[in-house]
């Protein structure tokens, strides 16, 4: 049994309280609670909810509205499914919304689904199958593909279906760079998520990476080699991604490598090298985003930045950027 006393906690302002149950009993046949933070997503929330409710192993879907001014709330209220719960969290941010939903979740497992994405058929079943084969795992994860605003597939990540990602003790690999890029591809054990304090609300970006690292510090991960999620690229989220720079991610790097729980579990003397690897990973990610949006001058600047940090890392970063250009 994992308790909050077993780990070093976040500050009180960021900490997730123990579960506060809604009047919905836990269902052993449907052990997953889906938490959806939502703000002005009327165009997509119906499709997102339908994809979650189509998963028979989902016992509840908790939508946390974060101050929507469009018809998001009305669309959620119109759905006649007893598994849907609506909460409000006035413009406190996505991390606070997720934490609030997690606090009130009754499921053994949590899945954090963005309100404009959609789960693929059988996604939750695939994750639970992997979980049964990994009883010590605190997080089970798979992979995703990308779709456009109309739901048409634009990514080609299916070409990588033979690729394996880390399982077991993944902390060292994860500290070097986030390979779980969307919460919709992962099940987090609710007890463990609450024990590590949930998402740090002080971080604007990469708060998920920090949380996954804390989870990896207390338990194992298991990879399920399936495409589980359609990650939607549309005007709002691509405009946001297009203006991010590597500097936007540095607070998360500092937080990860100043976290006592994480540092205590890293191999002695490894933190400096892993921090440098994480910085290179995030600059590479910035270059991948830039190439997707046709900002080729920024691509060259970011690759030059990587070369100055580590010439050995440059070829791999160039390959990743080239693959991103073709939706991989």
Place the predicted regions along the sequence by residue:
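C-terminal subregions of glycosyltransferases and related glycan-biosynthesis enzymes
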Residues: 1-26, 233-328
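Nucleotide-sugar donor-binding/catalytic module of glycosyltransferases
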Residues: 2-247
């Amino acid at each position: 049994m994992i308790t909050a006393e077993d780990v070093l906690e976040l500050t009180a302002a960021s900490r997730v309280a123990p579960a506060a149950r809604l009047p919905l009993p836990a269902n052993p046949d449907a052990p997953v609670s889906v938490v959806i933070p939502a703000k002005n997503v009327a165009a997509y929330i119906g499709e997102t909810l339908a994809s979650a409710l189509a998963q028979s192993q989902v016992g509840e879907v908790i939508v946390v509205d974060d101050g929507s001014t469009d018809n998001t709330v009305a669309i959620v209220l119109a759905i006649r499914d007893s598994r849907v719960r609506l909460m409000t969290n006035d413009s406190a941010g996505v991390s606070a919304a997720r934490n609030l939903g997690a606090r009130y979740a009754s499921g053994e497992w949590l899945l954090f689904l963005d309100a404009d994405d959609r789960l693929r058929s059988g996604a939750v079943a695939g994750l639970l199958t992997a979980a049964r084969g990994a009883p010590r795992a605190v997080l089970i994860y798979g992979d995703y593909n990308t779709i456009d605003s109309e739901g048409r597939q634009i990514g080609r990540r299916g070409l990588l279906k033979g690729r394996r990602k880390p399982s077991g003790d993944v902390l060292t690999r994860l500290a070097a760079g986030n390979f779980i890029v969307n919460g919709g591809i992962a099940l987090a054990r609710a007890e463990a998520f609450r024990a590590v304090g949930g998402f740090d609300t002080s971080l604007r970006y990469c708060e998920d990476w920090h949380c996954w690292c804390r989870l990896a510090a207390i338990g194992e991960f298991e990879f399920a080699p399936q495409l589980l999620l359609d990650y939607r690229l549309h005007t709002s989220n691509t405009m946001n991604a297009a203006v991010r720079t590597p500097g936007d991610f540095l607070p998360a790097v500092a937080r990860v490598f100043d976290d006592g729980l994480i540092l205590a579990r890293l191999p002695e003397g490894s933190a400096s090298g892993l921090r440098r690897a994480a910085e290179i990973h995030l600059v590479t990610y910035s270059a991948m985003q830039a190439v997707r949006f046709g900002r080729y001058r920024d691509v060259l600047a970011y690759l030059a930045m990587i070369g100055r940090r580590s010439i050995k890392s440059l070829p791999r970063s160039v390959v990743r950027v080239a693959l991103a250009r073709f939706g991989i």
